[in-house]
């Protein structure tokens, strides 16, 4: 079974920096495991590597699609497996780096995507009524409270899947996420995870948002806002929708920036919940441990040589 390295962690933890440090040392090429970095038109809010960083190490699945093109987890898996094959054929090590847990899990393990009959199953009337009264975001919040791992792989605006998941939970008394198929590995993967003290992670997220604002995030968000009438993949992405009330004159810029920081912190919490429940992770602390790069390199070499 082909060996690959995976580097995951919550937003803002320092995955890109560590990946760029490790890649030359292990002769690796990087596959982005972020569902938003595939899009050409948005770079700041998606925290893409810079042009200089992209030149330092060869990357895959970055800037490959327009936001107006469909791109699903199935597309990601199809293109990700091709990237792995290409990297291996070139004599290098595949290094998957990102924070979209479900996408990475689907690549590493042969998850069943789009289960047959999933949408045909009837849903409990109580959840349909809840949706009518409270809206799709509140419905998703309810799912997130009941089954965080399931919520991680369902977009808030996809009320159909939220209804389905809540129905399965209420009918079976078991978590929807635990009723997915057994793990069937596609690759022999060493999964390294980055995490640290929660308050330090949150502080880094806040600082990162401030830096994004300095680099032009507002202009990027305005592009997304001005194209909101066209159906596209980024309209609900964290980093853009939070500014819509500012552009419509409903909130101040400071209010929207604070909302983005809050949303980013909540997203980091959801990411960690998914990683801890769904993937076998070897955890490292890049904020407290000065030798995190050395430790990661040692674990990688042990894995590749066994």
Swiss-Prot record:
Keywords assigned by UniProt, alphabetized: ATP-binding, Magnesium, Nucleotide-binding, Transferase, tRNA processing
Pfam family, one: IPPT
Positions bound to ATP: 9-16
Region Interaction with substrate tRNA, annotated ranges: 34-37
Record-listed substrate binding positions: 11-16
Gene Ontology molecular function terms on file: ATP binding; tRNA dimethylallyltransferase activity
Keyword field contains ATP-binding: yes
Family classification: Belongs to the IPP transferase family.
Protein name as catalogued: tRNA dimethylallyltransferase
Species in which this protein is naturally found: Lactobacillus johnsonii (strain CNCM I-12250 / La1 / NCC 533)
Lineage, broadest ranks: Bacteria, Bacillati, Bacillota, Bacilli, Lactobacillales
